[in-house]
Curated annotation (Swiss-Prot):
Protein name, entry field: ATPase with bromodomain protein abo2
Biological role stated in the UniProt entry: Probable ATPase which may play a role in nucleosome organization.
Family stated for the protein in its record: Belongs to the AAA ATPase family.
Acidic residues biased stretches: 13-24, 129-146
Keywords per UniProt: ATP-binding, Bromodomain, Hydrolase, Nucleotide-binding, Nucleus
PANTHER family in UniProt: AAA DOMAIN-CONTAINING, TAT-BINDING HOMOLOG 7
Places the protein is found: Nucleus
Main location: nucleus
PROSITE patterns in alphabetical order: AAA (PS00674), BROMODOMAIN_2 (PS50014)
Domain Bromo: from-to ranges: 897-1026
Low complexity bias (residue ranges): 312-323
Length: 1201
């Protein structure tokens, strides 16, 4: 309606009237109280005030003609209301008090011939009240078809017609192109079918609508109602349509004297009495998200609602607003709703297999995805195969026996012991050729959601999908985050998730052939309901690897190292890495390999460019493992397990005898040396023999009675060192530490609860050891109630249970308190008093230190300043060398096509140049005028050297008088280069053409010079026209690849040549060394005589050992090496003397260190180590020995010994 008012207002030429109309329009617009983005509005105004403003307009509109019905009526203009609440029923009605008594036929003619402001939507006619029969018809209180505010609520249109006019209006104003009785097809096509009734409905109503006369109706619509064309209603185009659409057609606007009156009436009562319109409901069914995109999400699109029903959008506004809302709804909610309601078969749910693992991990290979790649867990692998593979592959066995197979297993243990690795290998190897097993890998956080009920729904869908594709395996990593212990302090959301998981694992509905595996580092934090048969039937404990397991893990991770690491060093490394987990050992091997790369190619760490490196030069040595062991931090430092911190090798040598004695006692008390036959060997026995063997084996559980061991250290003989080294010697025994610092370290946990937890873990993992250090200080540090609780827990252990109490005391047994002595009764406990290391132990202790002097000197500065070889850089285009052979062949084939294309185009250009510029077919300078050196075969006879103006200088020809250099380029040479593949780009072709031009310029011939420039210009022009940008770019890439390929090929040839020469030199040295040993069979020749032997004879001699003239063998006398041999002999003599001197020093130190205190030995040991380090660059080893002896005796003086 705003557009109609604006268009009518702009049609006037009077500025004063325009200002009045603007005032009215602004007032009417400012009174709109509600947003009209979805509904139609009506503006109210005061008729009296408007009457005063538009007096001039009403006075000029007196020549209008009204319909006969309007002339007959003397009352106010009747109101015509059209409701769009139900388009299927007639909604046109007149006010009965305002209707005349004209016949229905006249009314129908008025409807068909006239027009109103209502746009018929979905039909083929429009009514317009602005077009009247005569331009001289006067309006009294005329109003426009603006809508009242009540229509915003009822979605109806109200129209009113002018009051009865005067009879002085008889003139007709006709449009030139107007045909009476014919509606405008353009307006008929642009209809809004969703908001208006059909014209047939209007024919049933007595309506005094004037016939259409006057100006052509302009196609308009309301400011809110969208134009929705009904494709089913189409009429033939009017014959005047084309003329009206022509640019020469000019609309006939209304003049100033026939402008309408914009006076409006209040139709609030009429609109309020009309029925409420029905709601138009629009349901959006957006297309579903492609499942290929959905599969990449963690577990599907997180829904924004809690319901599983499809979201629907409703709108009571226009269709245009609904379209926008529908689009936003699809972006925000529609896709989510479709994904929620998608079938479970289309969801991803973390389904992985060997192919998925390889696609996500580019470094994964077949060997890394095999059970053989897991070391030290052979027993667990066997049980896992029995539990997982047997029910899935052979379900008929359990059906025959009417038993339920175990369908749940829990992995628990310290971090880095192979729990997740086991799941990855199981996912890659669980399926066979005959049986496909699905594997679902989920993490605890994947199933959680901020929406209430969403996590439970995801779990339900996961189990439904696993049941659908059974047999299947579901692996929950870090399951303690998904199913923690339910308590009153916990949120109800987590309790609901745990309850849902419990019901899904073992509820009323069976889950079929679905095996559930959980992994956690904290099994005690899991809900107890999960840890029962039916849910998690078995629990596999992944311990820290023992010595044999560490050896196996190191062998697996260093299998591809070159050269192969010696087995003796791997054994030593396995002994020194006590307390390392599988992940720590793998990180150790990785760090050693990276250190080898850093040592071999330090250039790659100082530049961002890529270099050409030879991978065969990388060699991992023992020194790389030594450096790597200093960088690796062990991750298995847990509060409930005593860390296995190894001591130095020198202290192991010092306490070797004491360690052996204590270890033997522990094994004897816990009966660790008792051999039991394996299960495989027992299965082969008959039933009776098996029962007898079982009865004998049961004796082991009754052989140990409350094992106790107390180790006392009166004079500080090294109790602290022994407490560290013992656990590295007792691999496979679970150790719980009751150290004072560990009991008091955690402020959030009371010592009593920690004490209860330690005893519980020790009894669960029997045979085990409860270790107490500084046991003599417990009565003074802890309260009586705590000590009583400790004694109560100690007595609660079964007498025959293999749980040992091991105590270390820094005093003798008599000085211990009665409380501590009660823990170690004399009749059932073992005692061991530590003694000071004897002479042999002290000698080995000091000799181990002094041996390091023989490794000196170390030139640290020279090593840092050593020169680094320069590596060749890899060109950016050399990535093709890294491609596979198949891709590389395809690339070379495409490059050949591009080169053929450029050759054909350049050959056409060259043919044109040859036909037009024949002077450049041969070189500019005649070959007979060039002097050639006499050593060459081509010598021009009959002329002296001074008679030649040009002479040959390398690859160019030089003129004698001015030393001008000619390239001697010509078309024949260019053609030869073209078809030999020398030109990869047009630039190279133009470069040779330019050489011809340069030679012509140097020749001095003006005509030849101009022709050469013209020829070069033609060549450039033809190259630009025939070769497009894409082909030019492809040619440049081909040229780069060709250069990189040639460089790589040349490098390989050089490397092969160097390797061949090195191998020949080695063969020659080997031949000479082997033959010189048999001097009787050789005729010795000096080095000068050997040089005179011909190459063939010398080569034949080297390979066959025979000369061409002698039948005896020929050998080459090596040069004199008397000086070198003398130095080596002196060095060997010095080493022997140094070793003897060091042994004497060790004996001397062992004799003078009978201190009865290990702490004093450590003091002397540290002083000697400092002295050796300070002299690390000294060449005179005897001087270092003298300084060490002086330091030793000075330390004894400082201690007062």
């Amino acid at each position: 309606m705003r557009r109609r008012a604006r268009s009518i207002r702009f049609s006037s030429d009077d500025n004063e009237d325009n200002e009045e109309d603007d005032d009215y329009y602004s007032n009417a617009h400012s009174e709109k109280s509600e947003d009209h983005s979805n509904h139609i509005k009506v503006s109210h105004f005061d008729p009296s005030s408007y009457k005063q403003k538009l007096v001039s307009v009403r006075e000029t509109q007196r020549n209008r003609k009204f319909s006969s019905l309007q002339k007959h009526l003397n009352t106010e203009t009747p109101s015509f209301s059209v409701s769009i609440e139900n388009p299927s029923k007639p909604s046109a009605a007149f006010n009965d008090a305002s209707l005349g008594k004209k016949s229905t036929e006249h009314q129908i003619d008025g409807i068909r011939n006239g027009s109103s402001n209502l746009q018929m939507e979905g039909n083929d006619k429009e009514l317009d009240t602005d077009n009247n029969e005569d331009e001289s018809t006067t309006f009294k209180d005329e109003e426009d078809d603006l809508i009242s505010p009540k229509s915003y609520l009822t979605s109806s249109k109200t129209f009113s017609y002018p009051k009865a006019p005067t009879e002085s209006t008889n003139g007709d104003y006709l449009d030139e192109d107007y045909v009476d009785g014919q509606s405008d097809p353009e307006s008929s096509n642009a209809s809004d079918s969703d908001f208006a009734d059909s014209p047939d409905d209007l024919t049933k109503v007595r309506s005094p609508i004037p016939s259409r006369r006057g100006r052509r109706k302009r196609k308009m619509r309301g400011p809110i109602l969208p134009v929705k064309k009904n494709l089913r209603v189409k009429k033939a185009m009017s014959p005047l349509r084309a003329e009206r659409n022509s640019p020469d057609f000019r609309r006939k606007l209304r003049s100033r004297d026939n402008r309408p009156n914009y006076h409006l009436f209040d139709y609030y009562n009429e609109i309020a009495s009309s029925p409420n319109p029905s709601t138009t409901k629009i349901t959006y069914n957006p297309p579903k998200l492609p499942m290929k995109d959905f599969a990449t999400l963690p577990i599907g699109y997180q829904s924004t609602c809690d319901s599983d029903e499809t979201s629907e959008l409703s709108s009571t506004s226009s269709e245009q607003t609904s379209d926008v809302e529908g689009l936003n709804a699809y972006n925000n909610l529609g896709a989510s709703s479709d994904i929620e309601n998608a079938p479970s078969s289309q969801l991803h749910f973390g389904h992985i297999d060997e192919k998925t693992i390889r696609s996500t991990d580019p470094f994964a290979n077949r060997e890394n995805l095999d059970f053989n790649s897991i070391g030290g867990l052979e027993d667990i692998i066997l049980q896992l195969k029995e539990m997982v593979m047997l029910p899935l592959l052979y379900p008929e066995v359990f059906l025959h026996l009417h038993i339920t197979p175990p369908r749940g297993v829990l992995f628990h243990g310290p971090p880095g012991t192979g729990k997740t690795l086991m799941a990855r290998v199981l996912a890659a190897n669980c399926s066979t050729k005959n049986q496909k097993i699905s594997f679902f890998l989920r993490k605890g956080s994947d199933c959680l959601s901020k929406w209430v009920g969403e996590a439970e729904r995801q779990l339900r869908l996961l189990f439904e999908e696993a049941r659908r594709v059974q047999p299947s395996i579901i692996f929950f990593d870090e399951i303690d985050g998904l199913a923690p212990i339910r308590s009153s302090k916990q949120e109800q959301t987590h309790s609901s998730i745990v309850s849902t998981l419990l019901a899904l694992m073992d509820g009323l509905d069976t889950r079929g052939q679905v095996v559930v595996i959980g992994a956690t580092n904290r099994p005690n934090d899991l809900d107890p309901a999960l840890r029962r048969p039916g849910r998690f039937d078995r629990e596999f404990y992944f311990p820290l690897p023992n010595k044999q397991a560490r050896m196996k893990i190191l062998e697996i991770n260093s299998l591809h190292f070159s050269p192969k690491i010696p087995e003796s060093y791997l054994l030593h490394l396995a002994e020194s890495t006590s307390g390392y987990g599988g992940a720590d050992l793998k990180a150790l091997c990785t760090e050693a390999a990276l250190n080898a790369v850093r040592r071999t190619f330090p250039q790659i760490y100082t530049s961002s460019d890529k270099f050409l490196i030879d991978l065969n030069e990388i060699s991992v040595s023992i020194c790389d493992f030594v450096v790597a062991s200093e960088k690796i931090a062990v991750s298995t430092r847990r509060s409930d397990v005593k860390p296995n911190i190894p001591i130095t090798d020198s202290h192991k040598i010092l306490f070797k005898k004491s360690i052996e004695v204590i270890t033997s006692k522990i094994r004897r008390l816990l009966k660790l040396d008792v051999y039991l036959p394996t299960v495989e060997s027992l299965q082969k026995l008959p039933a009776e023999e098996l029962m007898r063997q079982k009865e004998i084996n049961s004796l082991k559980t009754t052989m140990s009675f409350r094992p106790r061991l107390l180790i006392t250290d009166i004079y500080g003989y090294g109790c602290t060192y022994l407490s560290k080294v013992l656990f590295s010697m007792l691999d496979g025994i679970h150790v719980q530490s009751l150290d004072i610092s560990e009991l008091l370290m955690d402020t959030t946990t009371s010592p009593r609860s920690l004490l209860t937890k330690i005893f519980s873990e020790a009894r669960k993992n029997a045979p085990s050891i409860i270790f107490i250090n500084n046991v003599e200080k417990w009565p003074s540090l802890f309260s009586h109630s705590f000590l009583s609780m400790f004694l109560l827990l100690l007595d609660s252990i079964s007498p025959l249970e293999p749980v040992m109490l091991l105590g270390f005391a820094n005093t003798n047994q008599e000085k211990l308190s009665s409380t501590v002595r009660s823990w170690f009764p004399s009749h059932r406990s073992e005692y061991h008093d530590l003694s000071f290391p004897d002479y042999s132990s002290r000698y080995s202790f000091f000799h181990y230190l002094l041996k390091r002097i023989s490794f000196l000197p170390i030139h640290q500065k020279s090593a840092e300043a050593a020169s680094v070889d320069i590596l060749p850089k890899v060109l950016p285009v050399s990535k093709t060398s890294d491609l596979t052979d198949k891709v590389n062949r395809r690339q070379r084939k495409n490059d050949k096509k591009i080169k053929n294309k450029i050759q054909v185009k350049l050959s056409s250009i060259l043919e044109m140049l040859r036909s037009r510029y024949k002077k450049f077919k041969k070189p500019i300078i005649d070959l007979n005028d060039i002097y050639i050196d006499e050593s060459n075969e081509r010598v021009v006879k009959g002329k002296s050297k001074d008679n030649f103006e040009y002479f040959l200088s390398g690859n160019t020809v030089t003129r004698k008088k001015d030393n001008a250099c000619f390239k001697m380029m010509n078309f024949e040479e260019i053609e030869r280069r073209l078809w030999s593949g020398r030109y990869c780009t047009p630039k190279e072709f133009l470069r040779d053409i330019k050489m011809i031009k340069q030679d012509a310029i140097l020749s001095g011939d003006v005509n030849l010079k101009h022709k050469a420039k013209e020829m070069f210009a033609h060549a450039e022009l033809n190259v630009d026209e025939l070769i497009d940008a894409k082909l030019l770019y492809d040619c440049c890439q081909v040229s780069k690849r060709e250069k990189a390929y040639k460089q790589l090929k040349q490098k390989k040839l050089n490397n092969a040549k160097d390797a061949h020469e090195m191998q020949e030199s080695k063969n020659e040295e080997t031949f000479v060394r082997n033959d010189v040993a048999q001097e009787d069979n050789f005729i010795e020749l000096s080095s000068n005589e050997v040089r005179n032997v011909s190459n063939d004879e010398h080569k034949h001699t080297l390979f066959h050992g025979q000369s061409l003239t002698h039948n005896n063998l020929i050998a080459v006398t090596p040069p004199s090496r008397t000086g070198v041999e003398h130095k080596e002999e002196n060095k060997k003599y010095d080493n022997v003397n140094i070793q003897k001197t060091l042994a004497k020093c060790a004996e001397e130190f062992a004799e003078h260190t009978n201190f009865n205190k290990v702490e004093l030995l450590d003091f002397v040991y540290s002083k000697l180590s400092s002295t050796i380090w300070e002299n690390r660059e000294e060449h005179d080893l005897l001087k270092i020995v003298r300084d060490v002896r002086q330091t030793f005796f000075r330390s004894l003086e400082d201690m007062g010994v």
